[in-house]
């Protein structure tokens, strides 16, 4: 039995299963955990189908999503795998960013070929910036005709190419059900799939390698030392004595130097992505900085007031609006740590947006917000979440 020891040094990769309902996403997820458990028992728990299928509810930006998280390891990597069983859950997950993916396994039943949701999922994956897709051609045990399998494979490759994904991506013929039943040939197919995942999904850029950014959550004064801003470092690293800029919300940019980094009341040389820190800032008064601004590596992010967003609007049952909204709708847009009012312009030809819809809108904010394409936000009315979205394009 191959023994792989648990190493925290293994690269960590976030992946998920996507594809049409009933093509076997959840069964495949269960099969992967079983096959890897049998291969590396000390590294992996086996998860039964119904444990994954009964996806727990999660709240992300005020939206309830049913989503399952499983984790497993191959020899090379540690994976966190998300499976959103329902089609609506998948769409909500993609738009709200509840679980971001470094790559996805597109599950296509060989018996059906690509179906409408297959196309929709691939399109959404492109829109939200999933970097890589490879394919599990599931239920391949149920198709005897080699030509038919080749035809389905060709169709899937065309679909990937149409959305600018790698059309030479691995397409692995699997049978999740047979693998779960322990059929040796199909167990091997799942092993091959995971080898392909290891090899083809590129290693993600670590958050610490990106330029520094920290949203300001709180500001206070320490007598005799100066002003401290606290927050969770979103990306990058900040070192003591480095120059930073404070941007967003106000019209002007403030330059300053970090004279101290503190975490759990201890002084550090640096703060990095994921850390909850306090930054001591030189020459800054309490009123010079406020919640909702961001502290950044100089010149790496600019505040904007106009953008196009892709949004999901909560249905009435989800606690959203009971009525549609129209052009010039004025809700608050919650970015990172604060609400900013914005005016909505609907796409040409769209008269109104109904609760439960997903659509693209243009927004003009009354204050600038530091943003990049891909940044997530919630849409709120008086503190109640009515939708969620992501910045697709910055206009101004």
UniProtKB/Swiss-Prot annotation:
Catalytic activity: GTP + H2O = GDP + phosphate + H(+)
Chain intervals for the UniProt region annotation (G4): 138-141
Regions annotated as coiled coil: none
Keyword terms, alphabetized: Cytoplasm, Elongation factor, GTP-binding, Hydrolase, Magnesium, Metal-binding, Nucleotide-binding, Protein biosynthesis
Example of a GO MF term: GTP binding
Pfam families xref list: GTP_EFTU, GTP_EFTU_D2, GTP_EFTU_D3
Span list, region G5: 175-177
Cellular component per GO, a single term: cytosol
Location of the protein in the cell: Cytoplasm
Segments of this protein annotated with the region G1: 19-26
Ranges where the tr-type G domain occurs: 10-205
PROSITE patterns membership: G_TR_1, G_TR_2
Binding site for GTP: 19-26, 83-87, 138-141
Enzyme class: hydrolase
Region: G2, residue numbers: 62-66
EC numbers: 3.6.5.3
Binding-site residues for Mg(2+), renumbered to this chain: 26
Region (G3), start-end ranges: 83-86
NCBIfam families from the UniProt entry: EF-Tu, PRK00049.1, PRK12735.1, PRK12736.1, small_GTP
Role this protein plays: GTP hydrolase that promotes the GTP-dependent binding of aminoacyl-tRNA to the A-site of ribosomes during protein biosynthesis.
Family membership: Belongs to the TRAFAC class translation factor GTPase superfamily. Classic translation factor GTPase family. EF-Tu/EF-1A subfamily.
Subunit description: Monomer.
Protein name: Elongation factor Tu
Gene that encodes the chain: tuf
């Amino acid at each position: 039995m191959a023994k792989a020891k648990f190493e925290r040094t293994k690269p960590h990769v976030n992946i998920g299963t996507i594809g049409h309902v009933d093509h076997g996403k959840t069964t495949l997820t269960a099969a992967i955990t079983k096959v890897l458990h049998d291969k590396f028992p000390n590294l992996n728990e086996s998860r039964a189908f119904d444990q994954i299928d009964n996806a727990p509810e999660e709240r992300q930006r005020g939206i309830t999503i049913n989503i399952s998280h499983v984790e497993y390891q191959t020899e090379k990597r540690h994976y966190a795998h998300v499976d959103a069983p329902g089609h609506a859950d998948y769409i909500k997950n993609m738009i709200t960013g509840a679980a971001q993916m470094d790559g996805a396994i597109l599950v296509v039943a060989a018996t059906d070929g690509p179906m409408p949701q297959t196309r929709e999922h691939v399109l959404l994956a492109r829109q939200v910036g999933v970097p890589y897709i490879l394919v599990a051609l599931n239920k391949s045990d149920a198709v005897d005709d080699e030509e038919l399998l080749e035809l389905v494979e060709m169709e899937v490759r065309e679909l990937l190419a149409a959305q600018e994904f790698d059309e030479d991506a691995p397409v692995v013929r699997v049978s999740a059900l047979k693998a779960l039943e322990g059929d040796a040939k199909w167990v091997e197919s799942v092993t091959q799939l995971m080898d392909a995942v290891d090899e083809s999904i590129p290693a993600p850029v670590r958050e610490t390698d990106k330029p520094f950014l920290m949203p300001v959550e709180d500001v206070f004064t320490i007598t005799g030392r100066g002003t401290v801003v606290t927050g969770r470092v979103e990306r990058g690293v900040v070192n003591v004595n480095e120059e930073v800029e404070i941007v967003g919300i106000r019209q002007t940019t403030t330059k300053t130097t970090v004279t101290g980094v503190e975490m759990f009341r201890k002084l550090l040389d640096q703060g990095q992505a994921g850390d909850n820190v306090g930054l001591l800032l030189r020459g800054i008064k309490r009123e010079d900085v406020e919640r909702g601004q961001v502290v950044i590596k100089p010149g790496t992010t600019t505040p904007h007031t106009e953008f196009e967003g892709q949004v999901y609007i909560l249905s009435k049952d989800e606690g959203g609006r009971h009525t549609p909204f129209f052009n010039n709708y004025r809700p608050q847009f919650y970015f990172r740590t604060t609400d900013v009012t914005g005016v909505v312009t609907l796409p040409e030809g769209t008269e109104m947006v109904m609760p439960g819809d997903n659509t693209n809108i243009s927004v003009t904010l009354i204050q600038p917000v530091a943003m990049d394409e891909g940044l997530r936000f919630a849409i709120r009315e008086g503190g109640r979440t009515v939708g969620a979205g992501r910045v697709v394009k910055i206009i101004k």
